[in-house]
């Protein structure tokens, strides 16, 4: 049996990883930032030593895997909070990878489309040149490199446009705006793939429990298909039972931000599929399924509640 340790367990992806692992009957330990500061090398080493000991003591034939879902994700704030971004996104993964290698634990590190320049016209493959345009992207790329330099058998899994039931995200923001504004404008010149955190968690657990053959390295995992933020917003309005025409297109230059956003973030699943792993369903099917299963999660609470 696979024993799991999830870092960033209180976040959008981490909470779904813990929930999915629990429902699958897998032994799982979840650490949020309060329980484990990934930037503290000694704390990380103690945590992973204890995890390895407990996992091997419980099941001598089992395996132990750490999935790192912790990250500094404040893209704009990272432009000025550089040291903090690198501490969490580079040093943290390096500490985890080093201790995982030391104790014979599998390691999966979650990364991002922001490592690419965002100027492509076809889905990015795992070996396409990187070239981040923001501090956030550069810190995540530094983390990828630190992980694989320290622990070549580890897996780095890049994803994009993640949304889910936990915390704030684009879907919940659109629901709030739908309830409060007659019309909204959303950029139509940034293209990517909305990825449902629950689906992403399922894919990562498949990788953890049925490792890809061969050495470690980079993989891409997103829902399938592509759209723009404008197209995604209109699909959300449709799921809310609202008129999608209330969403109007605009361009990125109308919304200047401290950190540049990639114009193109679509990533190819070819390496994931070639490894014998299951591709994720379309982003449209994931959105519809999420609303059908728990519509109240993605709708703003009535005033006064």
Regions found by a protein language model. Name each.
Residues 2, 282-305:
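Amphipathic terminal alpha-helices
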Residues 80, 87, 91-95, 102, ...:
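Catalytic helix-loop patch of NAD(P)-dependent Rossmann-fold dehydrogenases
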Residues 41-90, 99:
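NAD(P)H-binding glycine-rich loop region in Rossmannoid oxidoreductase-like domains
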Residues 2-22:
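N-terminal Rossmann NAD(P)H-binding glycine-rich loop of SDR-like oxidoreductase domains
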Residues 7, 31, 69-70, 107-113, ...:
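SDR active-site strand-loop-helix element
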Residues 29-42:
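Rossmann-fold cofactor-recognition segment
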Residues 203, 210-259, 294, 298-305:
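Mid/C-terminal beta-alpha module of Rossmann-like enzyme folds, strongest
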Residues 148-192, 198-199, 205:
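NAD(P)-dependent short-chain dehydrogenase/reductase
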């Amino acid at each position: 049996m696979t024993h799991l340790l999830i870092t960033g367990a209180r976040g959008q992806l981490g909470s779904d990883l813990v929930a999915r692992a629990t429902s699958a009957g897998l032994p799982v330990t979840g650490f949020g930032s309060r329980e484990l500061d990934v930037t503290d090398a000694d704390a990380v080493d103690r945590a992973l030593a204890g995890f390895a000991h407990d996992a091997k003591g419980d099941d001598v034939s089992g395996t132990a895997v750490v999935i790192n879902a912790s990250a500094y994700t404040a893209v704009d704030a990272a432009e000025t909070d550089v040291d903090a971004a690198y501490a969490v996104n580079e040093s943290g993964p390096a500490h985890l990878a080093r201790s995982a290698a030391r104790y014979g634990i599998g390691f999966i590190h979650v990364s991002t489309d922001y490592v690419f320049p965002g100027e492509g016209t076809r889905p990015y493959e795992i070996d396409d040149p990187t070239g981040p345009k923001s501090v956030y992207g550069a810190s995540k790329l530094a983390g990828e490199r630190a992980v694989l330099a320290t622990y070549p058998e580890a897996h780095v899994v890049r994803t994009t446009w993640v949304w889910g039931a936990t915390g704030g995200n684009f879907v919940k923001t659109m629901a709030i705006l739908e309830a409060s504004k007659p019309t909204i404008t959303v950029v139509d010149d940034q293209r990517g793939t909305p990825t449902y955190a629950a689906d992403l968690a399922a894919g990562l657990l498949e990788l953890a429990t049925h490792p890809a053959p061969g050495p470690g390295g980079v993989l891409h995992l997103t829902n399938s298909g592509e759209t723009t933020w404008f197209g995604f917003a209109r699909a959300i309005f449709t799921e809310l039972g609202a008129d999608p025409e209330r969403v109007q297109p605009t361009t990125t230059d109308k919304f200047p931000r401290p950190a540049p956003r990639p114009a193109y973030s679509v990533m190819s699943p070819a390496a994931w599929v070639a490894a014998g792993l299951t591709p994720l369903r379309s982003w449209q099917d994931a959105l519809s399924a999420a609303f059908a299963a728990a519509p109240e999660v993605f709708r703003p609470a009535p005033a006064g509640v």
